[in-house]
Amino acid sequence: GVIELTKMIVQEMGKNALTSYSL
């Protein structure tokens, strides 16, 4: 569903954000 897809996108964005901040 859309909600599940949105959650996946948010998680991916979160991972990218954490990686950027770590660098």
From Swiss-Prot:
Presence of keyword Secreted: yes
Cystine bridges: none
Keywords: Disulfide bond, Secreted, Toxin
Tissue specificity field: Expressed by the venom gland.
Superkingdom of this protein's organism: Eukaryota
GO MF term list: toxin activity
Post-translational modification (record): Contains 7 disulfide bonds.
Cellular component GO terms held in the UniProt record: extracellular region
Cellular localization per UniProt: Secreted
Keyword Disulfide bond: yes
Record family assignment: Belongs to the phospholipase A2 family. Group II subfamily.
Protein's name according to its UniProt entry: Basic phospholipase A2 homolog
